[in-house]
Amino acid sequence: MAETNRAVIKLREKFSASVLDVKEFRGEVTVTVKREDIVEICNFLKSSLAYNLCTDVTAVDYLGKQEPRFMVVYNLYSIPNKDRLRVKAGVPEAGCSIDTVSCVWSAANWLEREVYDLMGVVFNNHPDLRRILMTDDWVGHPLRKDYPLQGPGREPYKGRLS
């Protein structure tokens, strides 16, 4: 199904060097692309293929399992075509950044702020990249796998747990 998906065919035609992987699982297609081309690819998906809704932006931390360490995931929906597409782009730990797609979908603005706040991925050229959930003085990014379980500077609980 993934290889016959219209979006996949068009992406491979226009961005053959940027499409790194295509997978299909339970009817949902995921396309992994180069992070350097994320804005151009997203512009194409919105303007040419009618993926007019960015429903979510999130990130996965693959600490110790694969490189690049982070994967930024964009969940897209085409209202006229009633079709979903997941786009992923790898982000290395060193220089942990990717260009913002808030210029493509305004809804991505706060979603990218959440990813920045909780995972520490910087979105280049974002109009207002600052914490959205944690306080401004919070140290670190609590959804990273190397973040201390009890929080920064706290001793592990020594009492009974059950």
UniProtKB/Swiss-Prot annotation:
**Is Secreted tagged as a keyword?**
no
Tell me yes or no: is Protease among this UniProt entry's keywords. no
Per its UniProt record, what PROSITE patterns does this chain match? Answer: COMPLEX1_30K
Annotated EC? 7.1.1.-
User: Residue span of the signal peptide, if any?
Assistant: none
Compartment(s) of residence? Cell inner membrane
Which reaction is this enzyme known to catalyze? a quinone + NADH + 5 H(+)(in) = a quinol + NAD(+) + 4 H(+)(out)
Q: Which UniProt keywords apply?
A: Cell inner membrane, Cell membrane, Membrane, NAD, Quinone, Translocase, Transport, Ubiquinone
Enzyme class, broadest EC rank: translocase
Gene3D superfamilies for this protein: NADH:ubiquinone oxidoreductase, 30kDa subunit
Q: Name one Pfam family in it.
A: Complex1_30kDa
Q: Which SUPFAM superfamilies match?
A: Nqo5-like (SSF143243)
Named from the GO MF annotations, one term is: NADH:ubiquinone reductase (non-electrogenic) activity
The membrane topology noted for this protein in its Swiss-Prot or TrEMBL record is: Peripheral membrane protein
Judging by the UniProt lineage, the source's domain of life is: Bacteria
Q: Name one GO cellular component term.
A: plasma membrane
What the entry lists under InterPro entries is as follows:
NADH_DH_suC (IPR010218), NADH_quin_OxRdtase_su_C/D-like (IPR037232), NADH_UbQ_OxRdtase_30kDa_su (IPR001268), NADH_UbQ_OxRdtase_CS (IPR020396)
Q: Give the function comment from the record.
A: NDH-1 shuttles electrons from NADH, via FMN and iron-sulfur (Fe-S) centers, to quinones in the respiratory chain. The immediate electron acceptor for the enzyme in this species is believed to be ubiquinone. Couples the redox reaction to proton translocation (for every two electrons transferred, four hydrogen ions are translocated across the cytoplasmic membrane), and thus conserves the redox energy in a proton gradient.
Summary of subunit composition and partner proteins: NDH-1 is composed of 14 different subunits. Subunits NuoB, C, D, E, F, and G constitute the peripheral sector of the complex.
Q: Which family does it belong to?
A: Belongs to the complex I 30 kDa subunit family.
In Swiss-Prot or TrEMBL terms, this protein is called NADH-quinone oxidoreductase subunit C
Give the species: Geobacter metallireducens (strain ATCC 53774 / DSM 7210 / GS-15)
Lineage runs: Bacteria, Pseudomonadati, Thermodesulfobacteriota, Desulfuromonadia, Geobacterales
